[in-house]
Amino acid sequence: MDPKRLTHLKQLEAESIHILREVAAEFDNPVMMYSIGKDSSVMLHLARKAFYPGKIPFPLLHVDTDWKFREMIEFRDRTAEKYGFELLVHKNPEGMAMGISPFEHGSSKHTDVMKTQGLKQALNKYGFDAAFGGARRDEEKSRAKERIYSFRDKNHSWDPKNQRPELWKTYNGQINKGESIRVFPLSNWTELDIWQYIYLESIEIVPLYLSDIRPVVERDGMLIMADDDRLKLQPGEKIEYKSVRFRTLGCYPLTGAIESKADTLPGIIEEMLVATSSERQGRAIDHDQSGSMELKKRQGYF
C-alpha cells in the first residue's frame, strides 16, 4: 500500500498493527500490559483489528496496586467480559501483606513495591518474553529515547545506552533465556492522535476522562479526587465539588485532575489543540525527584 495514500492516523494504525503481528510471530510467550487507560484502550482496539476474525493470541496483564479508581476496575472487568480476552490480574502479595499505601509510605515506595516489583513478579511468574506497553514518546523525556523494541536484561532493567538500532523499521528481537523485550506499538503517536483515533473509531474509554462534577481535594498543587474513604483530609483541607476530568489515570491518590468543561470527545480534542503541557504533569510519581521516570524505568518500571 502506498504510504502517500494513507491518512496520518491510518499510517500510525498500520505501523502499530505491523508491530503487534511481528511480536506475535517472533516471540514464544508475549503479553499485553493493560493499565485500563486511554492508550491501553487504543492498543487493545488495534490488537483486535490485527488478529480479526481470530482472538487476540496473547493474554492481557493488569498489575493492580489496589489503589486504582473504582471506575477503572469496573471498566476493566466489563471490557474483559465484552471482548472475551484472557485477563491476568496480579497484586504484589508482599506489598498487600505490608499494607503499602501511597499515603503512609509515599509515592516512590508505593510505586516501586506495588507497580515495579509487582510487574517483575508477574513477568517472572508467567515467563513472558515480550510485553506490550502503551507508552508514547511525547509523554515524557525518558520515554522520548525509548526504542519500539526496548531490551531488558534478566533483572528487567533498562539501560538506555544498551539498546538496538531500529533502521528502516527493522526490529531485533533476539534475546537469551531470561531476557525480555518491552514493545511500544504507540511510540510514534501523540496524545492528540490518541484522542482523534478514539473519536474516529468509537473506542470506549473510562468515563473519568470526560468532565463531570466530582469531589476533589487540593493537595500539593494537585486536585485529588476523593474516590473512597481511604482519603483522609489533612488540616485545612476540605472536599469541594468541581467540574474536572483526568488527562491520565493511575492510582487515585497520585493522579491529579484538571478543571475542564470537556464532557465530550470533540471537547477533549479542542482542549488538546491548545494544550501546552504534558499529560504526565498530573502524575505525582513523575515528580519524586529529578529524572525520576528514567530511574524507575532502569529499575524495571514500564
Curated annotation (Swiss-Prot):
Q: Which domain of life is it from?
A: Bacteria
Q: In which pathway does it act?
A: Sulfur metabolism; hydrogen sulfide biosynthesis; sulfite from sulfate: step 1/3
The record's section on InterPro entries has: PAPS_reduct_dom (IPR002500), Rossmann-like_a/b/a_fold (IPR014729), SO4_adenylTrfase_ssu (IPR011784), Sulfate_adenylyltrnsfr_sub2 (IPR050128)
Q: Which UniProt keywords apply?
A: ATP-binding, Nucleotide-binding, Nucleotidyltransferase, Transferase
- Any single biological process term in GO: hydrogen sulfide biosynthetic process
Coiled-coil-forming residues are none
Catalytic activity reads: sulfate + ATP + H(+) = adenosine 5'-phosphosulfate + diphosphate
Q: Which Pfam families match?
A: PAPS_reduct
**Basic and acidic residues compositional bias, start-end:** 280-302
Q: What is its EC number?
A: 2.7.7.4
The segments labelled Disordered in the record are: 279-302
What GO MF terms are annotated?
A: ATP binding; sulfate adenylyltransferase (ATP) activity
Record note on quaternary structure: Heterodimer composed of CysD, the smaller subunit, and CysN.
Which PANTHER family does the UniProt record give?
SULFATE ADENYLYLTRANSFERASE SUBUNIT 2
What function does the entry list? With CysN forms the ATP sulfurylase (ATPS) that catalyzes the adenylation of sulfate producing adenosine 5'-phosphosulfate (APS) and diphosphate, the first enzymatic step in sulfur assimilation pathway. APS synthesis involves the formation of a high-energy phosphoric-sulfuric acid anhydride bond driven by GTP hydrolysis by CysN coupled to ATP hydrolysis by CysD.
Q: Which family does it belong to?
A: Belongs to the PAPS reductase family. CysD subfamily.
Descriptive protein name = Sulfate adenylyltransferase subunit 2
Specify the taxonomic lineage. Answer: Bacteria, Pseudomonadati, Pseudomonadota, Gammaproteobacteria, Vibrionales
